[in-house]
UniProtKB/Swiss-Prot annotation:
Confined to roots. ATP 1 binds at residues 171-178. Residues 489-701, 1122-1336 form the ABC transmembrane type-2 domain. The chain crosses the membrane at residues 507-527, 549-570, 594-614, 625-645, 651-671, 735-755, 1141-1161, 1173-1193, 1229-1249, 1260-1280, 1286-1306, 1314-1334, 1369-1389. Residues 138-411, 805-1050 form the ABC transporter domain. May be a general defense protein. It is found in: Membrane. Belongs to the ABC transporter superfamily. ABCG family. PDR (TC 3.A.1.205) subfamily. PROSITE patterns: ABC_TRANSPORTER_2 (PS50893). ATP 2 binds at residues 842-849. Pfam families: ABC2_membrane, ABC2_membrane_7, ABC_tran, PDR_assoc. SMART domains: AAA (SM00382). This is ABC transporter G family member 41.
Length: 1397
């Protein structure tokens, strides 16, 4: 047991041990023990408490040194049943504070006439960012000013969020809820224009630190995937600090001592434990884990799209917990219930209500679909519509207000759902209650006018007119310090986390080091004893080995771009929350990478130095190592700085590629400094590669063994250096070392400054078409038209086969990381019937999605037991996928096509080939109307949270894509998550209509309103742990399910107008089972309903007479040619509308071509010696290698993004993997050809190559094939690896290999015979041979070569092994390479599946 030190040791001598039944009064024992604590000094007293150990004795403990078991024991004692015990805990804490007369700090938030406007760009035509539109737009910036318009998000809103009260923020998507929350928390983007004022306790936002005073909980769940839930919360608790808790605790302790009050030991221990700052593990973390229901997954990692982790609902709760674990009592929470069931939402909101009412917290929460029970927990409501406040007053008066406006909430309708629908033009009429008066649409402005004229509006206006009395609040209510911790504590916290992340990513670092070892082994054997002979030729080989080492270390830094970008989202969030300053994050990430650089550089030096044959002196060995180390550090620092400045993957890729190009071009090896144009010579001194070359060459060529004098009266070493222009004297080594250290310091300083001052990446700017903008402007002045019923045209009816899915005793097991087997589903039996809409419900973590995945066949791991039948026959996944549709919880779509195109693509590939195009298009149109997407059918889908559709639009698109496939069976995983009540009702009406056509439909659902819940016909209810609690019909008004549960002894009756779904989840949750002392799963198995269901399932599992097993004449609905055409059409749209992908490639090759042309200006016309030919070869090498590297890098992210879409579409049997892969391959051809043409047109005349059509064609052909090869190799590396990080690490090795065996750093003739096969396998060797041989293989001009006279063609054959007669073979190999690599890409895409489900 942890102790406080000497004082506690003395106090322990007074500890009273007591046994049960010893006759001493418990209160006297407690007072006696408490007296020992009271004797301690003040500081020790507030960190010392009594902890009951469970054996009728108490120990004196130091709360700063509590062990995990002790913290959890205390929390379990305080909060066993969350709803009741949390309230009791807060009341006890408040009672203790009130007993000594301490007033807690409170905050009142006011906003007056608050307006927010955003600028958007107006374009003519459709606002789609195609390649042509982007080029046109970029050019127009220089010709004319772009047209912009302003969109009002919030329009003069005013209100008060009061302490001690819970306020609900309601409104449809797009009404400005998120903007209002961000404005109140001081977190609005700098790109928007803000008017009006916001104040806390009468102080404007500029007078204090609002980000620390209030806590804003975003809709986006951004977490570090490698950290567990507990680690995430512990870090947040540590960084947010304790606020004024310690000061309050000291004052409580002082006053209690004066009044001789003995507090409850458990309450005292808890309050003291959460009042200690900077702890690695916090008691507050255990408390938040408990009340948010995250204690069951506390040690599970957060995970992400590519790594397994917690569920979506748990991630949403983690986002909430990360903020509320801090000391702030002003909470602004944005849609915290997404992905949560209604029972869990009620529990969390109930805890927040208790915090507001008892602790005086100020809480404003926006919710999309609050259940009636959750809605009743709020004190006030702010109703937003069209950026304006319609109602801002007590919740209890809101129905009365709308009745006064002529609208009444129906009896079995949730008030929150009614409030969101009553503002809708399409839904308003059904709530009109003045039947004697004709209905006409009442606009938002009319509601606002009525509210302002009401007594409620008058009271709000009157309160706002009175200034806040600052004398009535505590000084510490507001925060005036940016950071809670000292600089040292912040650095320690960030360092601890960085070390943990490095441990979690150890496989990636080991993988990188393993590849480095492989590269080193290859390099040392390629350059085996290259330095054994000291002459100009072998000196050139040694230079090549040095360049290879430096290039490998340069490429080794490239993955740092992706790693840094991947963490920037979480960093930006935490920086905005003032968890820590940028330097506290930067310093650990810089320093802790140094040991890895030391290891990698040392491995390379140890393996290669003596084998290659460098100077054998030990001192020179270590000096060689030091240069490699400082260069490696400078490269990693440079890429880190680039990532912190550019912030997006596309910008980082192009900037990183340009940086590598510049470093190599001006590094002194590709083109010697002496050969560079004078006016570009300054570039040499700005390249870290130059200084690394200077350092390595000075270390080697000024060594004693290179001091042999040559005919020119200079040493052999100086002769080699003179040829390369690197002879800067013996002491240039230390100059180079100092320069490299300077680069390391400069880039790391730049990285830190960019993190500090660079604005966070924002959501892409809005673009609106000119026509749409004019339409919006005109509608502002048009009267609202009467609602007229639209004549319904005949619906598109497509044939389908009704199918029943039965499942008996289904069990599912997975293997845990510890090697144990864990069962997730227990003996699940049921049936999904045609024409029946089935709801699959349960609390978060009950196994709903797991069961849906098992039934649909989406699981890629684990063991499934039991029987699943379709139409009475055993399920065959290949045919089942053709007749079923699956709407995923996470909306995965191709980002660069429109909404309508997404549906057309799905219909094209999934509907039978005999259905004509007209029928398909009519079906697409009908589905668009059904899910109300017709208004945005021409909108780009975009990336979630970055561009394109909103969450609810994306959700409707997911459903629409499946509906157009005309499936017999539809699985929907949480189709209403992220939707408001109206959108959810629209979606569920569409789903119900689909079920009524005779299709089999099942969907999981978390927070159904009464209306939505009662649209279902049957219910499958699961409890936590994957066990079945109920399967059967709902009945009218849920009568059958209510009757079943009410028949169980001890279950409370459902209240009038209560949502049966919420009631059902409440009574079957774990705490309710504990309270009732029963197991609902066992109760179901013992019921007659279970026996009846077993009989029904057995009957449905038998095939009917005359029926046949599901079969199709072909594996896919379309022919192979049809699949290829459809996939190619989508890939064309995706490429054409992705300028960030293709335009950057075009810009890079233009820049590369121009730079090479300027550096090698007209050098091809005057070849006099081997160095002139080496320089020309260097120009070819630069164009081929670096243009290829850039293409390879940029295509990888595109393929990785589209691969997730590919997995979804392949599962649906939309197409063959080969059709998808070859469409991806073919779409690259025109873009690569365009790049090749641009490169050839620029480079060929400027460098001065022979102006021959034949030679020019060879140049174009070689570059074109080279770009294709690199593109396809990038695709292949993505196909071979589970995530982009691994692919990028593999890319570094690939670059090193194609560089080493290109024939540039080591010619073919000198490559050892055991590695010559690698030369022939390297595509760059063939490309360079084709370029050089076609230009000079037939040139008979004599040149000076290492002191001899030889013809150019003879030198090419003698030194490089290039023959002009071999060009036919080269031409064949060049076209064979892309075909082979493309085929390998297609093969591995079809065989490998890294999706873990």
């Amino acid at each position: 047991m942890a102790q406080t030190g000497e004082d506690v040791d003395k106090a322990k001598s007074f500890q009273v041990e007591f046994a049960c039944g010893n006759g001493v009064d418990d209160e006297e024992k407690l007072r006696s023990q408490w007296a020992t604590v009271e004797r301690l000094p003040t500081f020790k007293r507030v960190t010392t408490a009594l902890l009951h150990t469970g054996d009728d004795s108490s120990d004196i403990i130091d709360v700063t040194k509590l062990e995990d078991a002790e913290r959890r024991l205390l929390i379990e004692k305080l909060v066993k049943q969350i709803e009741a015990d949390n309230l009791r805990l807060l009341r006890k804490i408040r009672k203790r504070i009130d007993e000594v007369g301490i007033e807690l700090p409170t905050v009142e938030v006011r906003f007056n006439d608050l307006s927010v406007e955003a600028e958007c760009q107006v374009v003519h035509g459709k606002p789609i960012p195609t390649l042509w539109n982007t080029i046109k737009g970029s050019l127009s910036k220089f010709v004319c000013s772009k047209k912009e318009t302003k969109i009002g998000i919030l329009k003069g809103v005013s209100g008060i969020v009061r302490p001690g009260r819970m306020t609900l923020l309601l409104g449809p998507p797009g009404c400005g809820k998120t903007t209002l929350l961000q404005a109140l928390s001081g977190r609005l983007s700098h790109s928007v224009k803000v008017g009006g004022k916001v104040s806390y306790n009468g102080c404007l936002l500029s007078e204090f630190i609002p980000e620390k005073t209030s806590s804003y909980i975003s809709q986006n769940d951004l977490h570090i995937p490698e950290l567990s839930v507990r680690e995430t919360l512990d870090f947040s608790a540590c960084c947010q600090g304790i606020g004024s808790r310690m000061e309050i605790m000291k004052e409580i302790s002082r006053r209690e001592k004066l009044k001789e009050i003995v507090p409850d030991p458990d309450i005292d221990a808890y309050m003291k434990a959460i009042s200690v700052e900077g702890l690695k593990n916090s008691m507050q973390t255990d408390y938040i884990l408990k009340i948010l229901g995250l204690d069951i997954c506390a040690d599970t990692r957060a995970g992400d799209a590519t790594r397994p982790g917690i569920s979506g609902g748990q991630k949403r709760r983690l986002t909430t917990g990360e903020i509320v674990v801090g000391p702030a009592t002003t909470l602004l929470m944005d849609e915290i219930s997404n992905g949560l069931d209604s029972s869990t939402t009620f529990q969390i909101v109930s805890c927040l209500q208790q915090l507001a009412h008892i602790a005086g917290a100020t809480i404003l929460i926006s919710l999309l679909q609050p259940a009636p029970e959750t809605f009743e927990l709020f004190d006030d409501v702010i109703l937003l519509g069209e950026g304006k406040i319609i109602y801002h007053a007590p919740r209890a008066d809101i129905c009365k207000f709308f009745e006064g406006c002529g609208f009444k909430c129906p009896e079995r309708k949730g008030v929150a759902d009614f409030l969101q629908e009553v503002m809708s033009r399409k839904d308003q009429e059904q709530y009109w209650c003045h039947r004697s008066k004709p209905y006409s649409y009442i606009s938002v402005d009319s509601f606002i006018k009525k509210f302002n004229e009401s007594n409620l509006g008058f009271l709000l206006k009157e309160e706002l007119s009175k200034p806040f009395d600052k004398s009535q609040t505590r000084k510490d209510s507001l925060c005036f310090r940016k950071y809670s911790l000292s600089k040292w504590e912040m650095l320690k916290a960030c360092s601890r986390r960085e070390i943990l992340l490095m441990k979690r990513n150890s496989f990636i670092y080991l993988f990188k080091s393993g590849l480095l070892v492989f590269n080193a082994l290859v390099t040392m054997t390629v350059f085996l004893q290259a330095g054994a002979t000291r002459d100009a030729r072998h000196g050139n080989y040694l230079m090549g080995s040095m360049f290879t080492a430096l290039f490998r270390l340069l490429a080794d830094g490239l993955p740092e771009l992706t790693l840094t970008i991947s963490r920037l989202g979480v960093f930006c969030k935490q920086k905005d929350l003032y968890f820590y300053p940028a330097w506290a994050y930067a310093i650990p990430s810089i320093i802790l990478r140094i040991p890895l650089s030391v290891l990698d550089s040392f491995i390379w030096t140890v393996l290669t130095y003596y084998v290659i044959g460098y100077s054998p002196e030990v001192g020179r060995f270590f000096r060689h190592f030091i240069i490699l180390l400082t260069f490696h550090l400078s490269c990693i620092s440079m890429f880190r700085a680039i990532a912190s400045i550019c912030r997006t993957f596309v910008a980082c890729s192009i900037t990183g590629a340009i940086s590598v190009l510049l470093l190599a071009l001006f590094g002194g090896f590709v083109i010697p400094k002496s050969s560079m144009p004078t006016w570009l010579g300054w570039g040499f001194w700005l390249s870290p590669l130059s200084y690394a070359e200077i350092g390595l060459t000075a270390n080697e060529f000024f060594s004693p063994r290179w001091r042999k004098l040559t005919s020119g009266n200079i040493t052999a070493g100086e002769q080699v250096l003179d040829v390369r222009g690197l002879n800067f004297g013996r002491h240039s080594y230390w100059t180079a070392f100092g320069a490299l250290v300077g680069f390391v310091l400069f880039f790391n300083a730049l990285y830190t400054l960019a993190l500090t001052y660079r604005n966070n990446p924002q959501r892409s700017r809005a673009i609106v078409s000119h026509g749409k903008n004019s339409q919006c402007s005109e509608e502002d002045f048009k009267p609202c038209p009467e609602i007229t019923s639209r004549a319904k045209t005949g619906k598109v009816i497509l044939p389908f086969k009704p199918l029943t899915v039965t499942f008996q005793n289904v069990q599912y097991y997975i293997e845990t990381p510890q090697g144990k087997t864990r069962q997730l589903l227990f003996d699940i039996t049921g049936a999904l019937k045609p024409g029946v809409l089935t709801s699959l419900m349960g609390v978060s973590g009950a196994g709903k999605t797991t069961l849906l995945d098992v039934l649909s066949g989406r699981k890629t791991r684990g063991i499934i037991k039991g029987e699943i039948r379709v139409g009475g026959y055993p399920k065959v996944q290949e045919t089942f996928a053709r007749v079923s549709g699956y709407c995923e919880q996470f909306d995965i779509h191709s980002p660069n096509i429109t909404v309508e195109e997404s549906l057309k693509y799905s219909a094209w590939l999934r509907l039978p080939y005999n259905i004509d195009a007209k029928t398909k298009n009519e079906l697409v149109k009908e589905v668009l109307e059904t899910v109300e997407l017709e208004d945005i059918k021409d909108s780009m889908v975009g990336l979630p949270g970055i561009s394109g559709l909103s969450t609810e639009q994306r959700k409707r698109l997911t459903i629409a894509v499946e509906l157009v496939s005309n499936p017999s069976i539809i699985f929907l995983d949480e189709p209403t998550t992220g939707l408001d009540a109206r959108a959810a009702a629209i979606v569920m009406r569409a789903v119900k209509n689909v079920a009524e056509t005779g299709r089999t439909v099942v969907c999981t659902i978390h927070q159904p309103s009464i209306d939505i819940f009662e649209t279902f016909d049957e219910l499958i209810l699961m409890k936590d742990g994957g066990q079945l609690v109920y399967y059967g019909p709902l009945g009218k008004h849920s009568s059958k399910v209510i009757k079943y549960f009410e028949s169980i002894p001890g279950v409370p009756k459902v209240q009038k107008n209560c949502n049966p779904a919420t009631w059902m989840l409440d009574i079957t949750c774990k705490s309710a089972e504990h309270r009732l002392g029963m197991d609902f799963a066992q109760a179901y198995k013992d019921s007659t309903l279970y026996k009846e269901n077993k009989m029904v399932v057995e009957q449905l599992s038998s095939a009917s007479l005359g029926s046949e097993a599901l079969s199709f004449p072909s594996r896919y609905s379309q022919t192979g040619w049809g699949q290829l055409k459809a996939c190619l059409w989508k890939q064309h749209c995706s490429y054409w509308r992705n300028p960030s992908h293709n335009l950057t490639r075009i810009v890079f090759i233009l820049l590369n071509s121009l730079l090479c042309s300027l550096l090698f200006w007209q050098k091809a016309k005057d070849i006099n010696n081997q160095q002139d030919l080496f320089s020309i070869f260097g120009s070819m090498y630069t164009i081929v290698i670096f243009s290829g590297i850039n293409n390879c890098a940029t295509v990888m992210n595109f393929i990785a993004t589209e691969r997730n879409v590919f997995y979804r579409e392949r599962f649906a049997r939309m197409y063959s993997s080969w059709a998808y892969s070859f469409s991806q391959v073919l779409v690259e051809v025109p873009y690569s050809l365009l790049q090749s043409l641009l490169c050839t047109i620029i480079v060929y005349p400027m460098i001065g190559y022979h102006m021959s059509v034949y030679k020019m064609f060879w140049s174009l052909y070689s570059i074109f094939c080279s770009l294709l090869i690199f593109n396809y190799c990038g695709m292949l590396m993505v196909a071979l690896t589970p995530n982009i990080h691994m692919a990028l690490t593999l890319r570094s090795t690939f670059f090193s290999m194609v560089n080493l065996f290109a024939g540039f750093v080591m010619p073919k003739q000198k490559i050892p015979k055991w590695w010559i096969w690698m030369y022939y396998l390297s595509p760059t060797s063939w490309v360079l041979e084709g370029l050089l041989s076609s230009q000079y293989g037939d040139v008979e001009k004599e040149i000076t070569v290492f002191g001899e006279k030889k013809s150019v063609s003879a030198f090419l054959e003698d030194y490089f092994g290039y023959k002009h007669d071999s060009l036919a073979v080269v031409a064949f190999v060049l076209i064979a390479f892309p075909i082979i690599v493309a085929s390998l890409f297609a093969f591995f895409m079809s065989k490998l599946n890294f999706q873990k489900k």
